[in-house]
Amino acid sequence: MASPSRQPPLGGSGLLHGSRARSYGSLVQSSCSPVRERRLEHQLEPGDTLAGLALKYGVTMEQIKRTNRLYTNDSIFLKKTLYIPILSEPRDLFNGLDSEEENDGEEEVRPSKDEIGSSSGRRKNRGSGSGRPNGTGLPPHQETSTPSHDLSASDFLKKLDSQISLSKKAAAQKLRKGESGVPEEDTGLYPSSPRMQQRAVLGPVPLTRTSRTQTLRDQEDEIFKL
């Protein structure tokens, strides 16, 4: 009996099938994920160190060694230049396509000046037409008064000055009324005595010179003479 033909297993790997064996080395790059690393060439100078280069470019010393295939005991001055691995952002891998799309999206979102003007005109028409049917208008004092947010700087300052002047006038009138009312209140609260009324009628009392005051003056003169 003839043995059935052997069929090769599906997905088998080996040298006969010509498929590449999967390796897990550090230098093998996966074809599924995009390359996110670019290399920067650095010219070595006499004062350069591996730690200084790692600190300068923001990478680790192991990354520099792996990129340049240096062992731990090797000196960096065996080569004239070193390649510094720098991680690139995923946005840089698309050659600026994402940035163009984002700019287009921002331009679509931003409204134009004409649209802004038309929308403001519609709002004004709605505000004037709503709430006043049959062509009835606003009262004159409401029509002339402008909203506070529409006032300019000069109008606001003029309004402030007028309020200050009005408050000053009111304070001055209040003080005048208070001064004119004080004597009336005093006369009503404190009745004048008959002696004060007599002084008010006769005027001030003249000073009289008595004999006692004369003798005192003479004694003072004698003391000064001595």
From Swiss-Prot:
In its keyword annotation, does this UniProt entry include Cell membrane? no
Where on the tree of life does the source sit, at the highest rank? Answer: Eukaryota
Among InterPro entries, the record links this protein to: LYSM1-4 (IPR045030), LysM_dom (IPR018392), LysM_dom_sf (IPR036779)
* Composition bias type Acidic residues, residue spans: 98-107
- Spell out the Basic and acidic residues composition-biased ranges: 215-226
Protein name per the record: LysM and putative peptidoglycan-binding domain-containing protein 1
Which Pfam families does this entry report, sorted A to Z? LysM
**Where are residues bearing Phosphoserine located in the sequence?**
S23, S33, S99, S165, S180, S193, S211
Please tell me one Gene Ontology term that the record gives under cellular component: nucleoplasm
Could you tell me where the Polar residues compositional bias lies?
Answer: 142-151
**Recorded name of the encoding gene:** Lysmd1
Q: Which key words tag this protein in UniProt?
A: Phosphoprotein
LysM domain sequence ranges = 40-84
Spell out the residue ranges making up region: Disordered. Answer: 95-156, 170-226
What residue ranges are annotated as transmembrane? none
